[in-house]
């Protein structure tokens, strides 16, 4: 049984994220989606909101668990007995950062591999930042996020409460 972790901020959880989960969950016996606290990024949604959103989108996957975490990824991976870290690469601009992160993770966790997956063509340009910006200006984000996520975005924007927690 090979366990993999797919860490990220997921702010918000997009169709691109789900695409990677769908594909990674077909490779590994168990996939743990690790929703990172990442307070330094000042997330739009609070940690519990991001966990709840991801659970709504991914609830139909039987071998996928959504778990929040703070601290080092190495500790999270060890806690879940993960052998692989899954990361998405949308563009060449992602590669340098992800390559450095993979090197650091290999140093900290020599027995854990990093697997890079590229999103399906229709999702290569999607980012949480773009989705939040479009939604905050009243634009249509239905092609980028699932209806439940769009609902969360609309409610959050209407409430004016960002960066909770």
Curated annotation (Swiss-Prot):
CC terms in the record's Gene Ontology section: cytoplasm
Binding site for substrate: 9, 41, 73, 87
Enzyme class, first EC level, given as a word: transferase
Domain of life, source organism: Bacteria
Keyword ATP-binding: yes
Family annotation (Gene3D superfamilies): HUPs
Sequence positions that bind ATP: 9-10, 17, 88-90, 98, 123-129
Protein EC: 2.7.7.3
Catalytic activity: (R)-4'-phosphopantetheine + ATP + H(+) = 3'-dephospho-CoA + diphosphate
Predominant cellular place of this UniProt entry's protein: cytoplasm
Protein's pathway: Cofactor biosynthesis; coenzyme A biosynthesis; CoA from (R)-pantothenate: step 4/5
Matching Pfam families: CTP_transf_like (PF01467)
Keywords tagged on the record: ATP-binding, Coenzyme A biosynthesis, Cytoplasm, Magnesium, Nucleotide-binding, Nucleotidyltransferase, Transferase
Keyword Metal-binding: no
GO molecular function, one term: pantetheine-phosphate adenylyltransferase activity
Localization per Swiss-Prot or TrEMBL: Cytoplasm
Single biological process term from Gene Ontology: coenzyme A biosynthetic process
Protein family according to the UniProt entry: Belongs to the bacterial CoaD family.
Assembly mode: Homohexamer.
Protein name listed in UniProt: Phosphopantetheine adenylyltransferase
Organism annotation: Polynucleobacter asymbioticus (strain DSM 18221 / CIP 109841 / QLW-P1DMWA-1) (Polynucleobacter necessarius subsp. asymbioticus)
Lineage: Bacteria, Pseudomonadati, Pseudomonadota, Betaproteobacteria, Burkholderiales
């Amino acid at each position: 049984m090979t366990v993999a972790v797919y860490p990220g901020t997921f702010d918000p959880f997009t169709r691109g994220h789900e695409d990677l989960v769908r594909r990674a969950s077909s490779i590994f016996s168990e996939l743990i989606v690790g929703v990172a606290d990442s307070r330094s990024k000042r997330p739009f949604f609070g940690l519990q909101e991001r966990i709840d959103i991801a659970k709504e989108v991914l609830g139909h996957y039987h071998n996928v668990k959504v778990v929040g975490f703070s601290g080092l990824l190495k500790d999270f991976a060890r806690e879940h007995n993960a052998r692989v870290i899954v990361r998405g690469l949308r563009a060449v601009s992602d590669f340098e950062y992800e390559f450095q992160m993979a090197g650091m993770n290999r140093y900290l966790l020599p027995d854990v591999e990093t697997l890079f997956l590229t999103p399906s063509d229709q999702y290569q340009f999607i980012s949480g930042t773009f989705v939040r910006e479009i939604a905050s200006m009243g634009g249509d984000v239905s092609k980028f996020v699932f209806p439940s996520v769009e609902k969360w975005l609309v409610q959050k924007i209407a409430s004016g409460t960002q960066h909770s927690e």
